[in-house]
Amino acid sequence: CALPIGEIISRPYINLTLQLMNDFGAKAKWLNEYQLKVEPQPYQSIPFYVESDWSAASYWYQIAALSNKAEIILPGLFETSYQGDSKVAEIFQLLGIESIYGNKMVTLKKTDKIAERLDYDFINQPDLAQTFVVTCALMNIPFRFSGLQSLKIKETDRITALIKEMGKLGYILHEIDDRILSWEGERCEMTADAAIDTYEDHRMAMAFAPVCVVMPEIRINNPQVVSKSYPYYWEDLKKAGFIIEEI
């Protein structure tokens, strides 16, 4: 049969599903780059530890990277993870954050080894793109991020949203071919008393909240959108010492 033409976006999520299916007794595997085979097989009940969410952890890596000093412990995360977004630890190492793994936890520590620029293909980790766009710009690290074509059809058009909201903070981003976002250090005047719009997108709210680490404050509209994936995000920020007020 004819195989489809095109790219598979977020392949690690498919691999995560296959791995969990196999863990619970199914027989599922890739036949080739585009085809899967799943055999008739009942699932089996087994003890299973549910790992914490690496996508949510990315915002704490972001906070550590933007801080002058930081040591943050994140429970429930494994060095060997099925989650594609566990790649966040490797990428943030380029931004000066070391990941030290312990018993079902990871500790984030600052280092002075920071890349002068960051170019990365997010085809397999598109949900991390907003985190790194905001972080790199605020750290004054030029970047070129590719593999972002799925961002146009997420909860919102995330590429357009990032360009607009980063513009409010004084950063001029450029979109190339609907799949690349770049920043080469261009700045513009900040919007006075700017409030970040979230576009009903949980990741817009969580990626922009850490801006307050380097700016006096940040206002975020419709903060309740975080409930989709991290309902206790604001409460956890308060526990870490952030002052959050509803206006």
Stretch-by-stretch model annotation:
Residues 1-247:
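Short, structured segments at the rim of ligand-binding sites
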